[in-house]
Amino acid sequence: MKSNSNIRPSIIEPLGNGAYHYNYNIVERQETNYETGEVITVFDYDTVKVWDEPTYDKLVKAVIRATFDEMQELSIINEYNAGVLGVTTDKADKEDAKKAYKDYLTFVAETKAKVQADLEAAG
């Protein structure tokens, strides 16, 4: 979920009742308040909700699921494997599947690194 605030969000935000928000991809920017003309600092970021302790594994899974549902993930993997195993013979389809799978794996690796860095920063 995309979020915006004029206060820097904490990386891990307890919501009560065992729920937490993980705020990531936090970007600080300046904008002009349309009512006062004053330049203010705002923060744009992504948010996912997890339950119980916000562990590395839970946060990685939540970020991946916020981008890819299970069916999309399986489709990417199956299309790639169909090309590798020769089930799909169209060269363009194979290349598209290979690129989609590589992009997915890159996203997962970047997500894992980001979550690890955020957890270290959050203490």
Task: Identify the meaning behind each predicted range.
Residues 2-123:
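A preference for well-ordered globular domain cores
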